[in-house]
Amino acid sequence: MEPFKHPIAILGAGSWGTALALVLARKGQKVRLWSYESDHVDEMQAEGVNNRYLPNYPFPETLKAYCDLKASLEGVTDILIVVPSFAFHEVITRMKPLIDAKTRIAWGTKGLAKGSRLLHEVVATELGQVPMAVISGPSLATEVAANLPTAVSLASNNSQFSKDLIERLHGQRFRVYKNDDMIGVELCGSVKNILAIATGISDGLKLGSNARAALITRGLTEMGRLVSVFGGKQETLTGLAGLGDLVLTCTDNQSRNRRFGLALGEGVDKKEAQQAIGQAIEGLYNTDQVHALAQKHAIEMPLTFQVHRILHEDLDPQQAVQELLERSPKAE
């Protein structure tokens, strides 16, 4: 199969979905960028740019915005879903009657679905064992759109789909590394958002660089425990989807999760912090999902548990830190 012959549909016109659409369209591929918001699509069609979520990066001629899901999927084999994790299942359900047996599903969504389900489990339940792939790694949308060097992991259950999708995406400025650990890649992408909130809170409380480094390192340990229980590979932890994305998300203020944590650490109300950011904060939703998963399987994740208490039980951030500092010494 020559992957460039057919258009590719990207479902989700936020900053990350748009950035991936630009990567593909700049390589001359026909890209259909779908949004459920008709007024947003009207704006993109009229202005030739996504001014709402990724301004200053004009659409190439081969990138078209769609609001009609059926039209966006017509004649398409490869679909790339880039919606918030809480909307992932709904999008799969909506597209189910519109696709055929040749369809291949990829996603750039980072998180778990309702019921603490991994996204590949949602796809398999609704669509069967179709070719699937997940894209993850340290990839700020604005830098991808600006054509700054970026490297990501792509994990798939199908070698041909993996090869074709890498060929679609890979370039000198957007490097795609093959991975076969879908479970590890998905779980790392879920936990890193929670840890970004934690490091943001720490920095908002002015706890210093040492504390930030400790949180990232101990957070990686928590991530590893979760990945291990579900059969993911430890090598994934030190790769782009694990350590790479974790470091970026925890240290760069372009990260929405980190900015949200910073605001909480500075004493800003949770709802006010959400409104100020204006886009989905995956860690806010996924803290609940990962916390439930850790409880169910008795996985020790103290940082995740404290972030959950701050977000869902109104625990004061200062008190959360104090309780962590009072924990008994452990072997590293």
From Swiss-Prot:
Reactions that this protein is recorded to catalyse: sn-glycerol 3-phosphate + NAD(+) = dihydroxyacetone phosphate + NADH + H(+); sn-glycerol 3-phosphate + NADP(+) = dihydroxyacetone phosphate + NADPH + H(+)
Location in the cell: Cytoplasm
Organism domain of life: Bacteria
Keyword entries, A-Z: Cytoplasm, Lipid biosynthesis, Lipid metabolism, NAD, NADP, Nucleotide-binding, Oxidoreductase, Phospholipid biosynthesis, Phospholipid metabolism
Enzyme class: oxidoreductase
Keyword Repeat set for record: no
A GO term, aspect molecular function: glycerol-3-phosphate dehydrogenase [NAD(P)+] activity
Residues binding sn-glycerol 3-phosphate: K110, G137, S139, K192, D245, S255, R256, N257
Chain sites annotated for binding NADPH: S15, W16, K110, A141, R256, E282
EC number: 1.1.1.94
SUPFAM superfamilies to which the protein is assigned, alphabetical: 6-phosphogluconate dehydrogenase C-terminal domain-like, NAD(P)-binding Rossmann-fold domains
GO cellular component terms, semicolon-separated: cytosol
Example of a GO biological process term: glycerol-3-phosphate biosynthetic process
Pathway: Membrane lipid metabolism; glycerophospholipid metabolism
Pfam families found in the cross-reference section: NAD_Gly3P_dh_C (PF07479), NAD_Gly3P_dh_N (PF01210)
Residues annotated as the enzyme's active site: K192 (proton acceptor)
Record family assignment: Belongs to the NAD-dependent glycerol-3-phosphate dehydrogenase family.
NCBIfam families, A to Z: PRK00094.1-2, PRK00094.1-4
Function according to Swiss-Prot or TrEMBL: Catalyzes the reduction of the glycolytic intermediate dihydroxyacetone phosphate (DHAP) to sn-glycerol 3-phosphate (G3P), the key precursor for phospholipid synthesis.
UniProt protein name: Glycerol-3-phosphate dehydrogenase [NAD(P)+]
